[in-house]
Structures are given as C-alpha cells and as structure tokens.
Curated annotation (Swiss-Prot):
InterPro entries: CtaG/Cox11_dom_sf, Cyt_c_oxidase_assmbl_CtaG. Belongs to the COX11/CtaG family. It is linked to Mitochondrial complex IV deficiency, nuclear type 23: A primary mitochondrial disease, a clinically heterogeneous group of disorders arising from dysfunction of the mitochondrial respiratory chain. MC4DN23 is an autosomal recessive form characterized by infantile-onset encephalopathy. Clinical features include brain atrophy, severe developmental delay, seizures, and dyskinetic movement abnormalities. The keyword Transferase does not apply. Exerts its effect at some terminal stage of cytochrome c oxidase synthesis, probably by being involved in the insertion of the copper B into subunit I. GO terms for molecular function: copper ion binding; electron transfer activity. This is Cytochrome c oxidase assembly protein COX11, mitochondrial. It is a single-pass membrane protein. Ubiquitous. The lineage of its organism: Eukaryota, Metazoa, Chordata, Craniata, Vertebrata. One of its GO terms (biological process) is intracellular monoatomic cation homeostasis. It is found in: Mitochondrion inner membrane. It comes from Homo sapiens. Keywords: Copper, Disease variant, Membrane, Mitochondrion, Mitochondrion inner membrane, Primary mitochondrial disease, Transit peptide, Transmembrane, Transmembrane helix.
C-alpha cells in the first residue's frame, strides 16, 4: 500500500479501491466525495480505510445511495407505445375472464353430468343404456315373439371407494321380446356407519340398449343403507318386440345387464324406491 500512495492522494472505496489524485479529480471521485471519512486522508488513510473495511471488495455505494444510481429510464411518451401497453393490458383482462368462465362452466357441468347422462341415455338408447319408453298402453298391447328366446345375464360391480356387498339374486333368465320380466339385486352395508351409494348401468351388446326398456330400477338414485342393513332391489323390464325385426339383432341371443355402485356424497336423502 505504501508503494502506491502519493502525498495528497486518498484511497476511495468505489468499485474496488482506487487512488484518486486531488489535482485530477474524476467524475467517480467527485460522486464519492461526500462518503469519504476525514480520517482517511493522509499517509495512513489507505491503511485505516482497509482496516475499517476489513478486506478488498466491490463497493455497494451505488446500491445504497440514490446519487450513485444511473438515471431511470423515463416512461415512454410515444402515443404508439402507450397504445400497445393499454392493448396488452386489455388482452390480459380478456384472457383472465375467459379462463374464469371456463372454470365455472366445468364446475357446473360436473354437477349436472349424472342427470344429463341419465336423460340422454334413456331417451336415445345410446351408450348401451336402456330406453325409458314403457307407456302402460304399449305394455298391455305387446305381443310376445315366442320363437325368439333371449338369455339375459346379470352382473354386479362395486367401486373401490364403496364398502358394500352387491350381487344379483339370479345369474341369468330367459325372456322373449314383448314380455315383461322381473329380476333382483341385493346390496348390504357391512360397515358400522350409514353409507349412501349410487349406481349406473350398462347393456351389452351396445346395439341392444335401444330395445331394453326398464319399467322400474334403482339406477341413478341415491341408496342409503344403515349399518348392517341389507335390501333387495328390483329391476322390472322388457325387450321391445321390434328387437326381433332388426337385422342387426339376428345373431344376438345374449344380453348382459351390468350395474356398478359408487359411493355418493350425502346431499338430500332419498328413500329406497319401491322395495316395500
């Protein structure tokens, strides 16, 4: 340090230690001048400055004092630039509005999914679901097709979230188009608390769903079972006589009716329909 020092020079802690000659002040020295301690001038100034700082390092004066910071870029006064910024803000607000609307729509659709699915499937017979077309006058006037025997197989499944015992009371029955049939499923709640379940159904083959008409069933309805309670749930149905006239059904001799029970969140409690 002594070899670098000259009489009248001072050690300036600005972006690394520098020796500033008083006769040739630089802009950096002038800007740092208000921060120099009086005792740093003279022969021992550099040594005392280093002892006070502790080590050689980059200065942080520019970050600590506004006088040493570069001038801020003023906001653009260009009308075109301002228009671009306003357009960008407007587009961002529009995007947020669309995202919020989609989120609300998806939430509403999730609540309406089961009723809409039930209405659609029962009306069209698509998705392998039965058709709700069983007017009493039609049932009374149906003519059974005796030479067309169909085997109806029954299947039962329970979702992993529902701790129920669920099974068909019969594995299969034989019917003919144009006559009604009655089958039963049995469900039991083996737990020590009330549980509410809800079921969906499916029919295989897919094309036979439009001819499989349910007069009474327990699908899409909440079923509440108390601890250890067991119930028999009926399925009253018939195969439309037009089944025998459809060329696609010529080789169809087996129809499978399958139910799957899921656990339902408790909303309004519905009684078990028609089990008395």
């Amino acid at each position: 340090m002594g070899g670098l020092w000259r009489p009248g020079w001072r050690c300036v802690p600005f972006c690394g230690w520098r020796w500033i000659h008083p006769g040739s002040p630089t802009r950096a020295a002038e800007r740092v001048e208000p921060f120099l301690r009086p005792e740093w001038s003279g022969t021992g100034g550099a040594e005392r400055g280093l002892r006070w700082l502790g080590t050689w390092k980059r200065c942080s004066l520019r970050a600590r004092h506004p006088a040493l910071q570069p001038p801020r870029r003023p906001k653009s006064s260009n009308p075109f630039t301002r228009a671009q910024e306003e357009e960008r803000r407007r587009q961002n607000k529009t995007t947020l509005t669309y995202v919020a609307a989609v989120a609300v729509g998806m939430l509403g659709a999730s609540y309406a999914a089961v009723p809409l699915y039930r209405l659609y499937c029962q009306t069209t017979g698509l998705g392998g679901s039965a058709v709700a077309g069983h007017a009493s006058d039609k049932i009374e006037n149906m003519v059974p097709v005796k030479d067309r025997i169909i085997k109806i197989s029954f299947n039962a499944d329970v979702h992993a979230s529902l701790q129920w015992n669920f099974r068909p009371q019969q594995t299969e029955i034989y019917v003919v188009p144009g006559e009604t049939a009655l089958a039963f499923y049995r469900a039991k709640n083996p737990t020590d608390k009330p549980v509410i379940g809800i079921s969906t159904y499916n029919i295989v083959p897919f094309e036979a769903g439009q001819y499989f008409n349910k007069i009474q069933c327990f699908c899409f309805e909440e079923q509440r079972l108390n601890p250890q309670e067991e119930v028999d749930m009926p399925v009253f149905f018939y195969i439309d006589p037009e089944f025998a006239e459809d060329p696609r059904m010529i080789k169809v001799d087996l129809i499978t009716l399958s139910y799957t029970f899921f656990e339902a969140k408790e909303g309004h409690k519905l009684p078990v329909p028609g089990y008395n």
